[in-house]
Amino acid sequence: MGLLETIQHPADLARLSDEQLVQLAQEIRDFLISNVAQTGGHLGPNLCVVELTLAIHRVFDSPRDSIIFDTGHQSYVHKLVTGRQHFSTLRQQGGLSGYADRGESVHDVVESSHASSSLSWADGISRARVLNGEGDRYVVAVIGDGALTGGMTWEALNNIAADKDRRVVIVVNDNGRSYAPTVGGLADYLRSLRPAIDSLRTHKAYEGNLDWTKNKLQNGGFLGQLMYKSLHAAKKGVKDWWAPQGLFEDLGMKYIGPVDGHDQKALESAMQTAKNYAGPVIVHAMTDKGRGYAPARADEADQFHAVGVIDPETGLPLDPSTAQSWTSVFAEEIAEIADERDDIVGITAAMLIPVGLHRMAERHPQRVIDVGIAEQHALTTAAGMAFGGLHPVVAMYATFLNRGFDQLLMDVALHKAGVTVVLDRAGVTGPDGPSHHGMWDLSMLQIIPGLHLAAPRDATRLREELREAVAISDAPTVLRYSKGNVGAEVEAIERLDDGVDILARRPAGSTENDVLLVSVGAMSEMSLQVANLLGAQGISSTVVDPRWVLPVPQSIIELAAQHRIVIVIEDGVRAGGVGSRIRQEMRAAGVDTALNEVGLPVEFLAHGSRGQVLDRVGLTAQKVAHDVVAQVLGTKVPFARPLPNEQITHTGQFPTL
């Protein structure tokens, strides 16, 4: 039996010798490589925090002390030492989450995997501890150097530093990367830091003597105050020369480091020093992403930040896909557009390769800007670029648009800025769970005045709609598409004057217009399946793809008036989505056709494959067709209306689909 199998609780780590800790760290790395290779997941980030996580759990007392992992994707080692070693289920439906999850363990605190929030959590928890008379409990926040590029971290630091009695330990896991190398002035600053004599500077006696001297000199008249200012300036100068950590200490935070993030004894010493100080402290640990796994270290792109199923020996995908992904289609097309237009600039929030801007960056490096993990800043700087005569294309995951909503509304839309926002991983994304599903965007974007929203159904439509988007210079445009591979081309049988594509219509010779199926984006294949199932029951249907769902095309309203019921199929939340907007436009035009919104419930959806998640919520062709048949027959609301001069007979019976 290996050491790892004997660890079921953090307290089990206390009995291990130095030699056993080294052995355990190696066992953990071997375990992660072997298991994540079979399921996929965040491998590189977890290989770099093995010793760091062990040190935290040996010095602090979880769950009495709260341990928070910013973004949470580096919590695998934490899971292992808190009794969760069934990694064969990682990111599988019903299995272990790829992030922290309160439903799994009392040791998990923050479930959201959106970056830069951990310090605000730490601020709030530590305040609650003090107010509840539990100020002796620690809060440890583990945050990467990449997440420190998010402005929210500095808002939290401003508050944490103001209260010297709260026991907050901020562990900066500095591997020089988020997905890719961390960029910006902060990254340069962190690289400049040098070791210092932290055990002295963070000792309570040192602080006490410093305060006593300060008070005596400041109360000693003009000469005393002059002497204090001189000594303070000298101290600061020596400190910044010896260890230029002034940024943190000028905020009022004690700084320890940099510490070798793979030296177990040094890490534990640093953690113990921070604990003994019993106030806000930053521990700066230098780590290697992908530590101990040669294929990860050799991966220049992101050092195996996230992998699919791979050969653990070589790191190569076991089933390399030859299909084209949505992201790669965008990457090719935006690079070609940039070749043609000098005013096109790309903006990414620390995700150059994942969102597909790398090809444009290879050809036009001066016209692709990585702003760090800063979606709010990305959108407002885009508005400024548009004012300056450029056309910015801001590419991000759909789930991260939530963070920049105010900037999109007030800085971009209010000023009618010609900015294109490209949302990757829209809809249900699968294994990464509730905080990564891009299911909120369709509802959020409905309320932004003047915004144009496109949802391409295939690669050809993505290319053409991207070009249409960047041709608009007086309003924001948004494109959204799914995660993974693009499906087969879905050709239209007709394109209407306002750009709406007719994908299928009633058989020739039929005079019935029962159902109008409005397919949003990648739901076209399902919509056509629904039409086929309805046709087998003698129910006629027309299938349309609006292409641009905002503003609602006039032809959609006209077609709605010609049918008995409208079914809008979308992979966003039903509340306030595309279906809801079409209903409002229909009513405003005096069209009283029944309409049913088919989409996702307003719930946080647990992880699983895309197909499994859609099946759980009933968003399948079989279920949708079954409901539509009932609505046409008049046994389920909303009832399909009779058309003028049409007599409809309701049977009240359900056919078998």
UniProtKB/Swiss-Prot annotation:
<dbReference type="GO" id="GO:0009228">
    <property type="term" value="P:thiamine biosynthetic process"/>
</dbReference>
<keyword id="KW-0808">Transferase</keyword>
<dbReference type="GO" id="GO:0005829">
    <property type="term" value="C:cytosol"/>
</dbReference>
<feature type="binding site">
    <location>
        <position position="145"/>
    </location>
    <ligand>
        <name>Mg(2+)</name>
    </ligand>
</feature>
<dbReference type="InterPro" id="IPR033248">
    <property type="entry name" value="Transketolase_C"/>
</dbReference>
<feature type="binding site">
    <location>
        <position position="375"/>
    </location>
    <ligand>
        <name>thiamine diphosphate</name>
    </ligand>
</feature>
<dbReference type="InterPro" id="IPR009014">
    <property type="entry name" value="Transketo_C/PFOR_II"/>
</dbReference>
<dbReference type="GO" id="GO:0030976">
    <property type="term" value="F:thiamine pyrophosphate binding"/>
</dbReference>
<dbReference type="Pfam" id="PF02780">
    <property type="entry name" value="Transketolase_C"/>
</dbReference>
<dbReference type="InterPro" id="IPR020826">
    <property type="entry name" value="Transketolase_BS"/>
</dbReference>
<feature type="binding site">
    <location>
        <position position="293"/>
    </location>
    <ligand>
        <name>thiamine diphosphate</name>
    </ligand>
</feature>
<comment type="function">
    <text>Catalyzes the acyloin condensation reaction between C atoms 2 and 3 of pyruvate and glyceraldehyde 3-phosphate to yield 1-deoxy-D-xylulose-5-phosphate (DXP).</text>
</comment>
<dbReference type="Pfam" id="PF13292">
    <property type="entry name" value="DXP_synthase_N"/>
</dbReference>
<dbReference type="InterPro" id="IPR029061">
    <property type="entry name" value="THDP-binding"/>
</dbReference>
<feature type="binding site">
    <location>
        <position position="73"/>
    </location>
    <ligand>
        <name>thiamine diphosphate</name>
    </ligand>
</feature>
<comment type="subunit">
    <text>Homodimer.</text>
</comment>
<keyword id="KW-0460">Magnesium</keyword>
<feature type="binding site">
    <location>
        <begin position="113"/>
        <end position="115"/>
    </location>
    <ligand>
        <name>thiamine diphosphate</name>
    </ligand>
</feature>
<dbReference type="InterPro" id="IPR005475">
    <property type="entry name" value="Transketolase-like_Pyr-bd"/>
</dbReference>
<dbReference type="Pfam" id="PF02779">
    <property type="entry name" value="Transket_pyr"/>
</dbReference>
<dbReference type="GO" id="GO:0019288">
    <property type="term" value="P:isopentenyl diphosphate biosynthetic process, methylerythritol 4-phosphate pathway"/>
</dbReference>
<keyword id="KW-0479">Metal-binding</keyword>
<dbReference type="GO" id="GO:0008661">
    <property type="term" value="F:1-deoxy-D-xylulose-5-phosphate synthase activity"/>
</dbReference>
<dbReference type="GO" id="GO:0052865">
    <property type="term" value="P:1-deoxy-D-xylulose 5-phosphate biosynthetic process"/>
</dbReference>
<feature type="binding site">
    <location>
        <begin position="146"/>
        <end position="147"/>
    </location>
    <ligand>
        <name>thiamine diphosphate</name>
    </ligand>
</feature>
<keyword id="KW-0786">Thiamine pyrophosphate</keyword>
<dbReference type="GO" id="GO:0016114">
    <property type="term" value="P:terpenoid biosynthetic process"/>
</dbReference>
<feature type="binding site">
    <location>
        <position position="175"/>
    </location>
    <ligand>
        <name>Mg(2+)</name>
    </ligand>
</feature>
<keyword id="KW-0414">Isoprene biosynthesis</keyword>
<dbReference type="InterPro" id="IPR005477">
    <property type="entry name" value="Dxylulose-5-P_synthase"/>
</dbReference>
<comment type="pathway">
    <text>Metabolic intermediate biosynthesis; 1-deoxy-D-xylulose 5-phosphate biosynthesis; 1-deoxy-D-xylulose 5-phosphate from D-glyceraldehyde 3-phosphate and pyruvate: step 1/1.</text>
</comment>
<feature type="binding site">
    <location>
        <position position="175"/>
    </location>
    <ligand>
        <name>thiamine diphosphate</name>
    </ligand>
</feature>
<keyword id="KW-0784">Thiamine biosynthesis</keyword>
<comment type="similarity">
    <text>Belongs to the transketolase family. DXPS subfamily.</text>
</comment>
<dbReference type="GO" id="GO:0000287">
    <property type="term" value="F:magnesium ion binding"/>
</dbReference>
<protein>
    <recommendedName>
        <fullName>1-deoxy-D-xylulose-5-phosphate synthase</fullName>
        <ecNumber>2.2.1.7</ecNumber>
    </recommendedName>
</protein>
